[in-house]
Amino acid sequence: MSASRTSVAALTSGAASAADSDASGDEALEAVYRQAGVPSTIPAVGEPLSCMLRDAARDFPDRVALDFLGATTTYSQLETQVARAAEALRGLGVGRGDVVGVILPNCPQHVVVAYAAWRIGAIVAEHNPLAPAAQLREQFHIHRGRVIIAWEKTLERLVAAVGSLEAAGLGGLSVYSVDLSRHLPLRSRLALRLPVAAARTQRRELRGKIPAGVRSWDDLAASAIPLATGFPLPSVSEAAALLYTGGTTGTPKAVCLTHENLRSNAEMSLAWASGTTSVGKETFYAVLPFFHAFGMSLSLLCAVGLAATQVVLPKFGADLVLAAWKRRPATFFPGVPVM
């Protein structure tokens, strides 16, 4: 009994010492953060995601928002493109709480579609454009979005894999294609037309055969009138995105995130970096995929929250990154160790 009591007392004493140690460690860390200018708390989110773009365009209208392989879009231009895309979505019957399926690599159209959907209170369901056809079909079934905006190459691959859009789970849906070359610099677009092997290879990397019945999202969005500025904003408590888990413990699952969830993540990240970043002066490399929580939070959201320039790369490649660096060096590079 004595030994037992001694053991319990020792364990209790050890636990208390550990708790005290943890508490003192937390206080020490907080002091370090405070010294670095990182606040211990941040204000609660009061506005939806689209207001981040509104504020950046208002304060830095002429700053480059997007650099896509050398073609640039200012914040003023981006805001206008988003307003047109938002009205285009409304014309397709998309409204508050409706799901828009997005199957795109990192590209200007991805940024525009996401902020357009958020502006009108729609939910962005993100999909990996390289995911297997069966996995995508299951994800379409889960969210039941009526509008799908997809990369041409993904649509071509799905039809090649299963035979038709219907077999891919897209039957009866409004499916629109995105041409990645549309936002290249003019010189690059013209070079793609050259009858040489290098041009053909690059065309195959960027574009794909569009299945019958699929219309151009690029044309639709460009021809739409801008959304009225007074159009009501969604509440921060409303759903904004469906992101799919990695599937390491089974079938990927859809995780629903609200405007408050996503913007809180962004605001906390910006608070962490507040001592080393300046609004309107940073250059982010958007290499992490937007369809992943990491890429969405630190590139699609944080960069806009800082009115930063995003150097948007459709995939990671050392050659692409180094070429971009010569043109526009990064000040902020969210990445993973292998990069």
Regions found by a protein language model. Give the residues of each.
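Structural core segment of the AMP-binding/adenylate-forming
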Residues: S2-S17, S21, G91-L92, R119-D219
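Conserved AMP-binding A3 loop
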Residues: T74-S76, A240-E267
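Conserved pre-ATP/AMP-binding loop-to-beta segment of ANL
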Residues: L194-Y244, T251, T276-T283
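Conserved structural elements of the adenylate-forming
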Residues: E79-R84, A224-L227, V255-T276, V287, ...
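A short helix-loop-beta submotif of the ANL/AMP-binding
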Residues: A86, V99, P105-A125, P129-A133, ...
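Conserved AMP-binding/adenylation subdomain of ANL enzymes
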Residues: R263-T283, F291-P334
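Adenylate-forming
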Residues: P105, A150-A160, V178-L184, L288, ...
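Conserved AMP-binding/adenylate-forming core of the ANL superfamily
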Residues: P43-V45, R54, D62-G93, D98-C107, ...
